[in-house]
Amino acid sequence: VRTGRSRRGRNGGYQQQSSSPHANAPGQTPGGGAHPHPPHNNSHNNQHSQGPGPTRPPEPLLVPGFDPATAPLIKPWEELTSIDPQPRLTMEYPGCPDSCRLIDLFCPIGRGQRALIVSPPKAGKTTLLKDIARAITHNSPECMVIGLLIDERPEEVTDFRRTFASFGNDASGNPKAVVMASSNDHGVERHIAVSMQCIAICRRMVEAGRHVVVVMDSLTRLGRTFNLSRRYASSGRTLSGGLDAKALEVPRQIFGSARNTEEAGSLTIIASCLIDTGSIGDQVIFEEFKGSGNMELVLDRKIAERRLFPAINLSASGTRKEHLLIPEADLKTVTALRRRLMQMPPHVQIEQLLAALRRFPTNGHLVGSAQ
């Protein structure tokens, strides 16, 4: 593991320099201030940037709070032992949005979770991702939150940056959350470089014992990006929807990096995935990642059209091994509540839950009243 200070190159990108005991967070300048653009390299360095691909030689990376003197004691990423996601990352806090309380009840998220937010267009996924990021910075200050935006609209990138900046700084004066983004006015190589550098930085932070949460929007656009690359979509075989047979190999490795480790830290990835876009390729991308996640939260367009938010489809949403994240007594009550709700239409389920959230100030009161 090597770390380094960064300097601005003539092309506006960041180039890595020699080791330094004081490394900066992703998107920060050596002075400590957040830079408005994520770190990226020029086209030559893109060919050698560290990422999930097995053939890329390592480059010095910026790891917040890492002392290079401890590098010989750190266990490499490939040798870390993966374990089940836990403990739970609690979303509920005083005055939190309803979405946070419903996630805690029906789709709990733990450290190391590989979570999919499955959503049709205009169902509220972006708002949900920002609510989750705010809740994590509020309740879990030990976690570093990174927003990874690929091929997003420039105004969405600005909105994310301002929202994340409003979360404030931690006790050390570093931002609680940063954004690494490549908007849709940039090219494919820029998208790939940003996503691969982000996940490489996260891996080094986990090796150093940090807990990292990546909020990604979206896996669908990431898959599209790699499908447009001559380097990564090079098998010569085309699947349904125009996807190259090798196009999703690296995106699978990126999403699969999320894990809790026994010897070091954890990497949690909460990524949105688009469905019902009218594109066969987008559906293929969703099916490819569906089996890789261990938590799935599905948003319903019909519920959103009734202006009911969060528009969660409870019957299709859930977390694997949720018994590790929810106390046994609460789990029995939540299971009974879920069974009762399954007898109602999806929009009625949300109406009933929102009414219950208004009656009870906390989830503890709600679950206790149902026991």
Model-identified regions with their sequence ranges:
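Arginine-glycine-rich low-complexity intrinsically disordered regions
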Residues: 1-59
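N-terminal non-cleavable signal-anchor helices
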Residues: 2, 60-64, 158
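Short intrinsically disordered coil segments
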Residues: 44, 75-77, 327-332
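Extended, compositionally biased low-complexity polar/Lys-Gly-rich tracts
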Residues: 48-72, 77-80, 174-191
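P-loop NTP-binding catalytic core
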Residues: 56-117, 123
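P-loop NTPase catalytic core
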Residues: 122-124, 130-371
